[in-house]
């Protein structure tokens, strides 16, 4: 009986990228992140996504500025969550408490997780990928993650203590002890 031989095609080795290398990547009109050393390229978000994210960022920013709570960062702001291999995530909205804002702010990606992260879902987001992002944020030290689903008119709240909550359109997102005094009815931003 002849011996069986499997054919294994020659594949290029997988190369990983670092956060510093990601800073030099320029792909026009694309959203890029680094996930465990692998470059992830996504299409830009649509109009509804942009409006929802901007409206929530505006309201959050007003509260943060009025009470000098810290800083709110817009989409495309990368945060280094892990090293070797590097993970750099860029949420739609991020908040850092005043005492955690780096001074001076680095030109690159800070090695810290925001206190609050907001992800606004787009039609091309896959549930498994979103949950992986949430897990990355929480394991890196984020206290509160809001995932806003404009299509379903609901939000999901994930906390660092492992608790979760669904927020219906007629209910409010609450900043809890992360953004004291902030509350926003979900339907007001949808």
Give the label of every model feature segment:
Residues 1-190:
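Gly/Pro/Ser/Thr-rich low-complexity, intrinsically disordered segments predominantly at protein N-termini
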């Amino acid at each position: 009986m002849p011996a069986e031989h499997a054919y294994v095609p020659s594949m290029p080795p997988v190369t990983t990228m670092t956060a510093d290398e990601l800073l030099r990547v320029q792909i026009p009109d694309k959203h890029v992140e680094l996930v465990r050393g692998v470059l992830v390229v996504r299409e830009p978000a649509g109009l509804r996504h942009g409006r929802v994210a901007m409206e929530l960022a505006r309201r959050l920013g007003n509260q943060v500025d009025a009470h000098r709570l810290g800083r709110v960062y817009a989409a495309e702001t990368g945060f280094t969550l892990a090293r070797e291999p590097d993970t750099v995530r860029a949420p739609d909205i991020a908040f850092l408490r005043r005492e955690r804002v780096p001074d001076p702010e680095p030109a690159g990606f800070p090695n810290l997780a925001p206190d609050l992260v907001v992800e606004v879902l787009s039609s091309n987001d896959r549930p498994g990928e979103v949950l992986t992002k949430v897990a990355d944020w929480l394991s890196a030290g984020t206290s509160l993650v809001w995932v806003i689903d404009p299509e379903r008119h609901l939000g999901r709240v994930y906390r660092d203590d492992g608790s979760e909550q669904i927020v219906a359109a007629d209910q409010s997102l609450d900043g809890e002890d992360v953004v004291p005094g902030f509350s926003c009815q979900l339907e007001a931003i949808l």
